[in-house]
């Protein structure tokens, strides 16, 4: 039983490390993407701050990466503690499991929502909005748009990984409630 728990903690640690790396890569790729082009004799620079949804994505992805790194430290601690044979207090581990579940859900929803919002803003930059007389920006800033597209893929992969982690957190919560715990005596 202890060996199975240790392998679960290790698997969670690997997945958290992957999510942290994906979210950090998405944040860095969005945050550091710039391109300068000359348009009608005027030099224009495209940055992440030009589209507020991209700025929000960069901040949310950075926060998600930090959260996953903190949870990864928790996995290392629990892996050492469970591997050493120590058994944490049942009530405090139940509260910790609930806290991790709620934080994982919040991180998954936030990462997914900001990535989708940034993707929606990028569709307007890709196709333009003729009714509003907005031109296609990706024809001008091709490299910038390609970098943003890459960061959107990384952000979505991080969101999917976080959703899988929240399912594992839910399983961890329900493990604390055995069928005999609340049976009528």
From Swiss-Prot:
It comes from the Eukaryota. GO terms for cellular component: plasma membrane. The lineage of its organism: Eukaryota, Viridiplantae, Streptophyta, Embryophyta, Tracheophyta. Belongs to the Casparian strip membrane proteins (CASP) family. Its main location: membrane. Residues 1-12, 74-105, 169-185 are cytoplasmic. The keyword Transmembrane helix applies. Homodimer and heterodimers. It is found in: Cell membrane. Disulfide bonds: none annotated. Residues 34-52, 127-147 are extracellular. Pfam families: CASP_dom (PF04535). Keywords: Cell membrane, Membrane, Transmembrane, Transmembrane helix. This is CASP-like protein 2C1. It comes from Sorghum bicolor. The chain crosses the membrane at residues 13-33, 53-73, 106-126, 148-168. It is a multi-pass membrane protein.
């Amino acid at each position: 039983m202890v060996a199975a728990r240790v392998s679960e903690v290790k698997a969670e640690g690997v997945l958290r490390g992957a999510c942290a790396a994906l979210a950090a890569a998405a944040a860095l790729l969005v945050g550091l993407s710039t391109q300068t082009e000359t348009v009608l004799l005027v030099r224009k620079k495209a940055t992440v701050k030009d589209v507020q949804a991209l700025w929000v994505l960069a901040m949310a992805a950075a926060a998600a990466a930090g959260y996953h790194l903190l949870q990864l430290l928790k996995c290392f601690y629990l892996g050492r503690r469970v591997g050493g044979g120590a058994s944490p207090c049942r009530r405090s581990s139940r509260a910790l499991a609930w806290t991790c579940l709620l934080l994982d859900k919040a991180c998954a929803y936030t990462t997914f929502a900001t990535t989708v919002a940034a993707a929606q803003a990028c569709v307007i930059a890709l196709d333009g909005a003729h009714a509003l007389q907005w031109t296609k920006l990706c024809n001008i800033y091709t490299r910038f748009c390609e970098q943003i597209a890459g960061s959107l893929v990384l952000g979505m992969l991080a969101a999917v990984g976080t959703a899988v982690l929240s399912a594992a957190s839910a399983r961890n919560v329900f493990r604390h409630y055995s069928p005999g715990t609340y049976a009528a005596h």
